[in-house]
Amino acid sequence: MKLDLGSPPESGDLYNAFINALIIAGAGNGTIKLYSTAVRDFLDFINKDPRKVTSEDLNRWISSLLNREGKVKGDEVEKKRAKSVTIRYYIIAVRRFLKWINVSVRPPIPKVRRKEVKALDEIQIQKVLNACKRTKDKLIIRLLLDTGLRANELLSVLVKDIDLENNMIRVRNTKNGEERIVFFTDETKLLLRKYIKGKKAEDKLFDLKYDTLYRKLKRLGKKVGIDLRPHILRHTFATLSLKRGINVITLQKLLGHKDIKTTQIYTHLVLDDLRNEYLKAMSSSSSKTPP
């Protein structure tokens, strides 16, 4: 994140000054929330002037983060990775704060093993859609598959953000703070038109909390034997988009990735599929060819 935060005050409340500097510099809401939480946690732990922090203070703080119980849902591997990612972001935030106040001590940034990208195939998608008995549930699945929206982005969509004439949605509450446009199919438009009938422009499209959405998808997935979570549908959108010919730069814009390297993870997944199909086909043909 390349933001000009200016210089810190010589005295006074460094924490609030840092957060205000982030806001003035145009940091996204997600960044501000993360940095404020991480730096507050760090300051509460060391309980001293941060300009006098030592390497020992930093090591004790990181150790305390590692020993805390996480609140992430999922299996043990998923929980462990999520915790590692959170700690990494906390450390990045505190490093930025310490650099801003001209403290030379820096905590090392731990590496996090890349998470395996899972996506549904066409058969699994149809199974999930068939398991939806309510228009609302089917619309949620279709929108996530059509748009690749993050769960929190979907839950922030208002009725007025939807353009039925042009099959598009204006996404305002994004991870990087930048608005973007996403699109949906005619089939999804029919569901949308039916679902929003009678709703006001300022109404939320789905008046749900993240936990409620998460549990809803898990229940739907359980019906058909699939581990269904919001981000798996985002991965599915990205993977299918590339397979259907959308170029990686366009996909980057649709997904709202600042760094194209994040988007390129999906190109590797598609290449793996192509390689497997090639090897399967060549193996089959060679077995039929006489020596």
UniProtKB/Swiss-Prot annotation:
DNA-binding found in the keyword field: yes
Q: Which residue ranges does the record assign to the Tyr recombinase domain?
A: 115-279
State the Gene3D superfamilies in the record: 1.10.150.130, Intergrase catalytic core
Q: Mention any one GO cellular component term assigned to this protein in its UniProt record.
A: cytoplasm
Annotated GO molecular function terms are: DNA binding; site-specific recombinase activity; tyrosine-based site-specific recombinase activity
Chief location of this protein? cytoplasm
Q: Which residues are catalytic?
A: R150, K175, H231, R234, H257, Y266 (o-(3'-phospho-dna)-tyrosine intermediate)
Q: Which GO terms describe its biological process?
A: chromosome segregation; DNA recombination; DNA transposition
InterPro entries, per the entry: CB, DNA_brk_join_enz, Integrase-like_cat_sf, Integrase_catalytic, Integrase_recombinase_N, Integrase_SAM-like_N, Tyrosine_recombinase_XerCD, XerA
Pfam families cross-referenced by the UniProt entry: Phage_int_SAM_4, Phage_integrase
* Residue stretches making up the Core-binding (CB) domain: 9-102
Question: Which of UniProt's keywords are assigned here?
Answer: Cytoplasm, DNA integration, DNA recombination, DNA-binding
- The superkingdom listed in its UniProt entry is Archaea
Localization in the cell: Cytoplasm
Q: Which family would the database say this protein is a member of?
A: Belongs to the 'phage' integrase family. XerA subfamily.
Q: Which HAMAP family match?
A: Recomb_XerA
Provide the function of this protein. Answer: Site-specific tyrosine recombinase, which acts by catalyzing the cutting and rejoining of the recombining DNA molecules. Probably involved in the resolution of chromosome dimers. Binds to the dif site.
Q: What is this protein called?
A: Tyrosine recombinase XerA
The species is Saccharolobus solfataricus (strain ATCC 35092 / DSM 1617 / JCM 11322 / P2)
